[in-house]
Structure formats: C-alpha cells, structure tokens
C-alpha cells in the first residue's frame, strides 16, 4: 500500500485518539518573553532527525493565534514530523518587516532546538495560511531575514503557502484597480518600492538555495489562482521546483481547517510533496 494511502486509512480509525506525542506550549523564542513571540511544539514520542514543520497562522497580519491548528499537529506527528506552530506580533503595533523578523527568529529557535525534540535542524519546512502564507513565501525567498539570524536558506527544505494572493503585490494591485484595499495600505504602505520589497516574487533568483514549493489555493478564487501560477512560473524559471494544486470545493477557511483530515485531497498532495523531501 502506498504510504499516503496507508496514512489516510490509518487516520480514519485513530484520529479520535490523542497521538503518542510530546507537546510543549508557549515557548518563548525571544527574550524578554512576549506572548506574541512564543510557539508550541508537537513532537513524536520517539525517533531522531525527523523533519521539522514550522506553521505560520493567518489573520490578515493583525490577528490569529498559534493554537488554531485544527488536525495538523496530529496528522504530521503521526507521519514522523516535528510540528512547530508560532505566534508573531501584529500590524499596526509593529511593522511588517518586524513581523518578518519574528518569523526568522522562530525559525532560528526551531533550528537551534530541533534536536531536543527529535528533529533535524537542517530539514525545516515552512508552511502558512493566508497572511501566514505570504510570510512563509517571503522568508523562503528573501534570504536577508534568515541572514540576520545567522542562518541561510539551506536549512529550509520546502515551503507550502496556502491560499494567498500577494506573491506579487504590484501585480495584485494592478489587477485590483487603482485603489488598494485598506488592509494592503495598513500592512504594506503605499510606496511602490515597499510593495516590491515585500513581494516574494521579487527575491526569486537562481542559486540562492530557495527550497521546493508546493503552492495550494482555492480553485474558485481567481486572485489566488492567478498569483499562485504566476509565482510558480517565476520559481521554475529560476530552477526552483514548484507545484501548484487547486483545491476544489474549498473556501479560504476550509482549505486550512481541513488540512490533516482523512480523505482531504490537499492533504494528500501535501503528504506526497513532503515524502519527496525526505
């Protein structure tokens, strides 16, 4: 039986039970401790050198929480992954660049402490939904954030952004018309140069060790579909492996909440992608 099929069959019978996992909550990744700069770790009870998944929640860059992970920790721990879900500070209390700094610091913590939880510090997969997908894609392409933490993109083995429409902010604004949405103004400002700098597509280049991408989007959302395919095209032009999967019958919310659910097609695509990285 194929590994993914076996997982889905097993999950159907055992998801009701708690996984055999070690769970550590509210771990600070900066000092002094700030509630918005903490993370939770879900790790297999045994094993070493397991890949590490760092999950970034969504919420329009100004709300959300690391606890909103639904079935994901259970699903990935059962497959032998260390699952880390991180908080980060919000706009407008801090700038989007400071938010990116938080994400890089969370990755630094995962790298430094992975082995304590049976994880491989040099095999980190970054994932996120909505605003978290933008943050994931940006930290995996703009290497300056990890460099500020003394790291490089080499420690990242994969990136899975889930349903976001701002891989290329200037292009997105052109498609939306002359007036950008209010959220865009608050988060990205109004300067064209800042829009380019905060666009993951801007930082794509060959030879940077950008990790492989699996880009998930809701099939019926034209803006995320267009941006996903445009971003993937640019990644491939730079020699980066990129796969786009359209999730049929999903909403912006359910593509996230259903990840890890038995029989979910995006989950199956995700597990197959992860399997190729091991």
What do the predicted segments below correspond to?
Residues 15-278:
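Alpha/beta-hydrolase superfamily serine-hydrolase fold, recognizing
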């Amino acid at each position: 039986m194929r590994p993914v099929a076996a997982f889905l069959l097993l999950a159907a019978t055992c998801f009701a039970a708690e996984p055999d996992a070690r769970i550590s909550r509210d771990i600070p990744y900066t000092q002094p401790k700030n509630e918005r700069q903490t993370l939770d770790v879900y790790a297999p009870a045994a094993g070493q050198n397991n890949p590490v998944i760092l999950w970034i929640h969504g919420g329009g860059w100004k709300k959300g929480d690391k606890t909103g992970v639904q079935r994901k920790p259970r699903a990935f721990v059962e497959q032998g992954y260390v699952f880390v879900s991180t908080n980060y500070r919000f706009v407008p209390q801090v700038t989007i660049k400071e938010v990116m700094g938080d994400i890089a610091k969370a990755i630094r913590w995962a790298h430094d402490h992975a082995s304590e939880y049976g994880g491989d510090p040099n095999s980190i997969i970054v994932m996120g939904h909505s605003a978290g997908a933008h943050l994931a894609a940006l930290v995996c392409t703009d290497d300056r954030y990890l460099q500020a933490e003394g790291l490089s993109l080499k420690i990242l083995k994969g990136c899975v952004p889930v349903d976001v429409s701002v891989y290329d902010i200037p292009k997105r604004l052109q498609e939306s018309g002359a007036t950008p949405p209010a959220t865009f103004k608050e988060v990205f400002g109004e300067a064209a140069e800042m829009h380019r700098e905060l666009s993951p597509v801007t930082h794509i280049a060959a030879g940077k060790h950008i990790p492989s991408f699996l880009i998930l989007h809701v099939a019926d959302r034209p803006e995320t579909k267009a941006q996903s395919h445009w971003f993937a095209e640019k990644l491939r032009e730079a020699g980066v492996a990129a796969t786009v999967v359209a999730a049929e019958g999903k909403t912006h919310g359910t593509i996230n909440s259903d990840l890890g659910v038995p029989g979910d097609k995006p989950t199956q695509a995700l597990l197959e992608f992860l399997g190729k990285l091991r």
